[in-house]
Regions:
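Exposed regions on extracellular, virion, or secretory-pathway luminal proteins
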Residues: 2-3, 71
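Short beta-strand element of the alpha/beta-hydrolase
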Residues: 3-10
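Flexible "cap/lid" subdomain of the alpha/beta-hydrolase fold that forms the substrate-access gate
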Residues: 11-17, 25, 33, 38-76, ...
């Protein structure tokens, strides 16, 4: 059996972003986990801190479940999910067979793209999200080439 796979989406995505890639990969009977990060497809769970470390801890728990059943896991992360995947690989290398990243800039001088800087600004990020709404975010994603059905997710 092929190693288990763990795909982690970015911001403002959902697990739907992986659909076309998974179809193209034709992974057969390989166990595949494509979870939604807490708060991304529904309300943030009560008490969840929504910090990098909280998301990394959550991801470790998810990967531990896969590794317990299938052995070391192949991790794939995009954008914010890539940052979390890297953190999982750093703190729990015993769970990881391989890891691959997309759209993650790891450079101490990189400040993030314009929208990421807005999201990271207290109060401004919340206002931006309240004003933007799902339709505006979906349009932004389709303008960047994401299929409309996935962007609407």
């Amino acid at each position: 059996m092929m190693a288990a796979k763990f795909f982690l989406h970015g911001v403002p995505d959902s697990p739907a972003i992986w659909g076309p890639l998974l179809a193209a990969l034709n992974l057969g009977d390989a166990p595949v986990a494509v979870p939604a990060m807490p708060g991304f497809t529904g309300p943030l769970p009560a008490g969840f801190a929504a910090t990098k470390e909280a998301y990394a801890d959550w991801a470790v728990t998810e990967v531990e479940r896969l590794a317990a059943a299938y052995g070391p896991v192949d991790l794939v992360g995009h954008d914010w999910g890539a940052i979390i995947v890297q953190r999982v690989a750093m703190i729990r290398p015993d769970l990881v067979r391989s890891w691959a990243l997309s759209n993650a800039v790891i450079d101490p001088d990189y400040r993030g793209h314009r929208v990421a800087r807005i999201w990271n600004t207290p109060l401004l990020g919340e206002i931006f999200m309240a004003i933007s709404g799902p339709a505006t975010l979906a349009k932004s994603l389709t303008d960047q080439g994401v299929p409309a059905d996935i962007a609407a997710e």
